[in-house]
């Protein structure tokens, strides 16, 4: 199963290029490196983050119901999840911080019919462990919790407030297709454009 996590609004290096900041995710390490944190799903049930180290690949989206790009990309989140969950890849939304209420998150998910599990990270514990700092941001993890891809969903938004008519590069989809074919993604890391996680 694959987990995609989305968070995040910032502008930085062009997402058309690999992230050349020199910063590496804490997940660029051994399998099973995600700590087992006791978190809660939006529906109130328990979520142990250590489950991301096993069973299936996961796409993890870091999200915020107040970030304009999380609103703009909601349809893309849904279509990717519908397509790839049917092929055995798990999708999870992660909401870091407490700047918004659970009611706001529920309204966001209901409005855009996002039906994959949503996890709350009020203390940023999992967000920090993932090395994520933007919403929306996507991570693709293999079945052992190792990072396959991290960054933007595509290059539709190339700066905050600036979008192409249509994306010309589909970073996350390309990474998913490569993963399914047993290959490395064309880009393992891109610079996400969106809202800074605070």
What are the residue ranges of the model-derived segments?
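C-terminal motif of bacterial Sec signal peptides marking the signal peptidase cleavage site
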Residues: 5-8
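Bacterial signal peptide processing site
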Residues: 10-12
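Structural microenvironment flanking redox-active thiols in thiol-disulfide oxidoreductases
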Residues: 71-112, 120-129
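Short, internal strand/loop/helix patches
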Residues: 108-150
